[in-house]
Amino acid sequence: MIKIGASILSADFGHLREEIKKAEEAGVDFFHVDMMDGHFVPNISMGIGIAKHVKKLTELPVEVHLMVENVDLFVNEFEEMDYITFHIEAVKFPFRIINRIKSIGAKPIVALNPATPLDAIEYILGDVYAVLVMTVEPGFSGQKFIPVMTKKIRKLKSMIVENGYDTKIFVDGGINVETAPLAVKAGADVLVAASAIFGKDDVKTAVKNLREAALEALNKDFLTKSFNSNEEKQ
């Protein structure tokens, strides 16, 4: 089952309570909160207070995405969060960060920028809950999905399966009804969308269309693999 996370980067912060409620009623599975420091990425976004406020406004899980240089300074601020995502490019001691996240009761997710090779996470792949594949350059909402990232997602899926891990694949960046099927066919388990949800007049319909597009791709992929498997047996 494909899960959908609503990134509040595109939400109306002047009416955040209402935005959260609309997304909940639309059927999103969790909320994704980006935190940018203006150093790791050029933009500055939500601070610690906003992430904590979102957590108070919903019963759904909340993931905080740390797009910051000094991950160590921020992890302990988010002990009430369900998932904490850090960038492999920002840390020297990833196992230490992973263990710290686990120690406060959250699930660790490691993120990779588009140009970062999968080799960078090879040795921590079995220790994280998920890998978040950035399909745009991090820092700004509304960017276009980078098509070649589907190759990266497929390779990551193969690494996970070959090693017998249960690690999930999150995909974040440029996700909409056109690109969601591409990510799902490549192996994504979770889709994070911002403007494709909060940028729409009818949030409920937007989430419905996004989920249907993802599930249709998943079902087609399953049927194709089943057909090919039967052909090989004959």
UniProtKB/Swiss-Prot annotation:
Q: What is its EC number?
A: 5.1.3.1
* Cofactor(s) the record lists: a divalent metal cation
GO cellular component entries = cytosol
Tagged with keyword Metal-binding = yes
List the SUPFAM superfamilies hit by this protein, alphabetically.
Ribulose-phoshate binding barrel
CDD domains, per database record: RPE (cd00429)
**InterPro entries named in the record:** Aldolase_TIM, Ribul_P_3_epim, Ribul_P_3_epim-like, RibuloseP-bd_barrel
Its top-level enzyme class, in one word, is: isomerase
Q: Where does a divalent metal cation bind?
A: H32, D34, H65, D172
- Which pathway does the UniProt entry assign to this protein? Carbohydrate degradation
Q: What does this protein do?
A: Catalyzes the reversible epimerization of D-ribulose 5-phosphate to D-xylulose 5-phosphate.
Q: Which family does it belong to?
A: Belongs to the ribulose-phosphate 3-epimerase family.
Q: Which protein is depicted? A: Ribulose-phosphate 3-epimerase
Q: What is the lineage of its organism?
A: Archaea, Methanobacteriati, Methanobacteriota, Methanomada group, Methanococci
